[in-house]
Amino acid sequence: MMIFAKNNNLNFAVVVKLLGMLLLIEAAFMLPSAIVSFAYHETAAMWSFIYSIAITVGAGALGFLLPVRNHDMGRREGFLLTSLTWVVFSFFGMLPFIFDPCGLPVPDAFFETMSGLTTTGASTMESVENQSHGILLWRSVTHFIGGMGIILFTLAVIPMLNKQSGLQLFNAEVTGLTHEKIRPRISNTAKTLWTIYIALNIILIILLWAGPMNLFEAICHGMSTIATGGFSTRDSSIADFNSNYIKIVMTIFMFIAGISFSLIYRVSKGDFKSLIKNDVARWYFFIAIGAAAAITAIEYVQSDEPLSQLVVDIPFQTISDITSSGFNATDINLWHHGSIMIAIALMMIGACAGSTTGGIKIDRLVLIVKNLKNEMYRILFPNAINPVRVNGKVLSNDMTAKVCAFRLLFALSLFVGSLALSLSGINLFDAIFTSMSCLSNNGLGYGFTGQNFADINPYGKWVLSFLMLVGRLEFSAVMILLTKAFWSK
């Protein structure tokens, strides 16, 4: 047991024990898919989940039963647990895809699971319509788990983490510039956020079921939408339903899912002024509206689609892009290059921090623009003191430095990912688009990946899986593990 001793002041034992708890939770999330497979008489698929549950429970029990003397967790343990959780969840979550009769190779299965958990929504399946109901549900469940965050769910259900260690985990996984506790206790904050998340899922599922979708498809698409994931039960995504009702309803809920859940909480309490006065929410609204209007104008001139259909499809696709949902209401391969460039910009920017979306986040964009404005002002008036304010709060120089570091890591990761894909034979533009799609957790395909990501070689799938992980955890929780300082005393 010496391997689990507190080596170099890093408490490995408590990390392993918590990983065991988390695997038991993951096994519980697999159970509905096994039940659905049984209900649809998909015996082979049902057994694939039973095998997966048994293996996951066994591994989880080993970790959970590990004796731990010291339950203290610091920042390093928080970062280590956060990163390991997403990787371990992906390794065990891929088991149903491997054991299924339509089994995927390991690189494809890991990619599919990482894509689901990070709510990227990119798929290696050539046809999802050939998959069992259990597998289709499991894909959407991975979105549901990852949308609000694996660690955040753990904070809501494991009382022992309602300490300083819980705050470390919260800060390691939650996205954005600052992390707001809307309740005094971190566990209550997690429970409140998950309550809002589940409520939005239920409302959307009911609305989709009231339309052309059956209950099963409504459940799958409801979870995928609020998580801004993008997995669908149809090969042609939402376009296959040919329903403006579905597109309009999902556009509204994708937009809502792109707003900070802390802000949604305040609005649910009747504080509508907080939404109106919020700088980030206003930028989000105007960027989305402006981009939708610009793309609609371009496609109206360049395509043969009637305006009546463009005003439904383009807002859907625009909100899908900026919220990193990755759903398709139209074939973007037919778009004008100007529209594609706007879509890439939206993918990179993302929506609001504290939501289920990917990308750089509008919060950082607001800070970058305001800081640039201040720098221009200082050139004219060197002695002027004009601090950067976002939502009425003065942001420190340290916060600005963190945003600059984030931009550098984002650009570096995009460059390395694009280079790696281009070396595997993909043309440069497709390599950049695909890397951007995975790094921003968008999942949208174009050109080589227009239909799916199946044709990318195994090496490329591992690269893209890593990009999805660092994009979801916003670099620091993963990159810090690669530094010598993290492992030293």
What are these regions (language model features)?
Residues 1-489:
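Membrane-proximal intracellular helices of multi-pass ion channels
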